[in-house]
Swiss-Prot record:
Modified residues (Phosphoserine): 267
Classification lineage: Eukaryota, Fungi, Dikarya, Ascomycota, Saccharomycotina
Localisation: Nucleus, Nucleolus
Function: Required for 27S rRNA processing to 25S and 5.8S.
Similarity annotation: Belongs to the RRP1 family.
Protein name: Ribosomal RNA-processing protein 1
Single GO biological process annotation from the record: rRNA processing
Membrane-traversing stretches: none
Compositionally biased tracts (Acidic residues): 265-278
Top-level division of the source organism's lineage: Eukaryota
Organism: Saccharomyces cerevisiae (strain ATCC 204508 / S288c) (Baker's yeast)
N-acetylmethionine sites (modified residues): 1
PANTHER family reported in the protein's UniProt record: NNP-1 PROTEIN NOVEL NUCLEAR PROTEIN 1 NOP52, RIBOSOMAL RNA PROCESSING 1B
Amino acid sequence: METSNFVKQLSSNNRKTRVNALEALKKYLTAKQFKENKQIEFNKLWKGLYYAMWFSDRPRPQQRLANELGELHGLYFDPKDNSTADELTTNDKAFIKFSRGFWKVMCFEWFNIDRYRLDKYLLLIRRVLFSQLKYLQSRNWDKKLVDEYIKKVLRWLPLSGSPKVYTGIPIHIVDILLDEWERLLKDGDEDDEDEENKEEEMRKIAESAKKTPLADVIAIFQDIVADYNNSKVLREKIKEDLFSDTRLVSWDILEGETQHNDSSNESEEEEEEEWKGF
């Protein structure tokens, strides 16, 4: 696939050109030869998709492209894979490599994104995170797959706590994680104005959330907070905006009062001890 021409076509304002490029991309992604490629080929592909987003310069095409790029993860889902137990399928392995490719490119290119382009990349991250979680859900939250995703995707880079990852990325994940998880669990119906129906929907979401590996994902953030070497800004953001979210309590992911309130004081004490004087 010729990357430069492909990028221009995918970011084109001409609908027909854009649709044709997208269809060609889908065929390329699902070809057996590509799925079995090494990680570097997935990274190269995402570098091209990153620039397709870069050159998309109108609001509606940007939103549409963010949706389309996110939905590419779903191409690797095959219902037949749900009958395969205790091993990752070829599709699962391709999904992991495709997911890693996205986060690698985003984390390493983040410093180059100017303020005029920032919003569309924040939207892209939101759409991609949702689609990655959607794939896991489609695979019935297969434990081996979820563990692989957490270890080789989330903990590997975007939520590694590494100083090489600009804090804007994990902070954005903190902002969107529970909203996207809740969207994943909704039936897809339009918002109902009836208060009783809303309460019933919230009960259903809470019950569904308990059956997901959300606690395993939250554990990543707990580890980040527990490590005082990680960014104080990020740790405070996690405690204030994620751990304090009432949904985690209503979904039985966290207890009402966690020890993270205490760890805030401990964190401050440790950082005071690190002061070297004049």
